[in-house]
């Protein structure tokens, strides 16, 4: 069998000079002489130095062994030795190579050690430089938060103060408001404007200072976006300027269109418009689908011998019903539309798949051609601002967006086609990197009413209904609002609370028709209903006076949902409390979510078992009755 000669790697210097046996032996003898000299010198030292040196030599030898191990490489030569002495020569060769490798490690350091007898052997042997960068030898730095790159109008909004109890503006301080409207405000018990109203009303009145037919200087006014907490008076902020701008109209046309996501919210806004147009010739129409299409058509247009006559100046509508009238109502025209108001704008943007906004804009800029009626007053789609485009003034279409959770996503806002928009916000604008560290830690993504207190209650799934009943009974609230994530949960909780007794309870969901929901809300406002169990249908913009307590029976899945739910209380400067029932698996995610929302303080509210014990007997009886009721309802559905 042929045997292969394996050469050992003896370091870069040996590799460069050639691994010959003579050279390796010479280096080994030199190294041996140096080591013998060093040993004799150590014997002459004092005992304590000898002890120290011996320990250091052992550590150096151990370190040398650890270094040598990874440096060994196996290299197969191409020649074979046929004689029987090859294995023995191979071993001798390997030993010599190892000794040579030791001599090549650091000859300068060893010679320095021989010249300095008092040197520490640990310092003589230096570690080879690391082949790569060593990670971990750096201090941890706080990573600066990356600021989003936003358009200028989003990054630098017009800041509005938050407090609706301290930062009030007397109505006399805004003389631009018409005296008749000021008188109407006082008649409704309003003597001061909230911060949002004091900022937005003058801006809107300025855009209509020369009438609603043309903008300031003949140019199109900027669109306005308002982001403010729930209960801060956003509705009145657009009702007052719109009514004042249309006070002196001569011919009745649809000049203002308010689009809202729900029927209940549309009813509420229509009610506010009716209050402030009661003493004016302006007419308000509600288009939500609560009445038949024919009935709504009668309130919008009237057929005459010459064609159709418009009967409404202000239309409050939901998106679906509005599109129905655009398609199916003869004489329904938006060509004279001056104000397009989108309330709860974030939700309306999410419903853009219905394509209601492009339909409205197309109807507003519809042209009958040069031979049509009022051809001189017909307007065209907005284009680039040039000298030619300003020669013929036309009535602008101004868009007004209002929401408590207005998105800052430029991609979503781009769908609205805003013209030189201006943002009013209670949140801080985008800060420079230098100012970011100085921003208050509580200034988060959204703002909340000042008088609102936030709590979370850890609990088990089986005890959630019992905790709801305990909170309502112990706090003695005249009006409490409880939110669930589904219609089924709302219905079962309603049946359980009804079987438990002691609480006047009602259910508010899509299970009931518009007429029934309106009746339930009215009874709740009058105090006839103590606990209203609802889905998120009432979480958007519904202003129910006197709600003292909001309970999240099911934890909200999204941040915006939480903002709108808890915003049903602590409205218009009043105080309120919000409790969220959390399972153990929900706590971490929920707490992280609300911390990003800018909640000032979330209180941990633990309910001891002994406080729930007196209610357990009635609760178990109600559970058994609930089971029977659910079975009966299932039989009725199956029948």
From Swiss-Prot:
Record's compositionally biased regions (Basic residues): 64-76
Start and end residues of each stretch annotated as Disordered: 1-131
PTM annotation (Phosphoserine): residues: 79, 432
Domain Helicase ATP-binding intervals: 215-424
Gene Ontology BP terms: rRNA processing
Segments forming domain Helicase C-terminal: 467-615
Position of sequence motif DEAD box: 343-346
Reactions catalysed, as given in the entry: ATP + H2O = ADP + phosphate + H(+)
A GO term from the CC aspect: nucleolus
Ranges of Low complexity composition bias in the record: 50-63
Known EC number: 3.6.4.13
N-acetylalanine carried by residues: 2
Chief location bin: nucleus
A Pfam family that the UniProt record links to this protein: Helicase_C
Subcellular location(s) per record: Nucleus, Nucleolus
A GO molecular function held by the record: ATP hydrolysis activity
UniProt keyword list: Acetylation, ATP-binding, Helicase, Hydrolase, Nucleotide-binding, Nucleus, Phosphoprotein, Ribosome biogenesis, RNA-binding, rRNA processing
UniProt short sequence motif Q motif, positions renumbered to this chain: 193-201
Residues at which ATP binds: 228-235
Origin: domain of life: Eukaryota
Bias kind Basic and acidic residues: ranges: 24-48, 94-105
Entry similarity comment: Belongs to the DEAD box helicase family. DDX51/DBP6 subfamily.
Comment field on protein domains: The Q motif is unique to and characteristic of the DEAD box family of RNA helicases and controls ATP binding and hydrolysis.
Function summary: ATP-binding RNA helicase involved in the biogenesis of 60S ribosomal subunits.
This protein's name: ATP-dependent RNA helicase DDX51
Organism of this sequence: Mus musculus (Mouse)
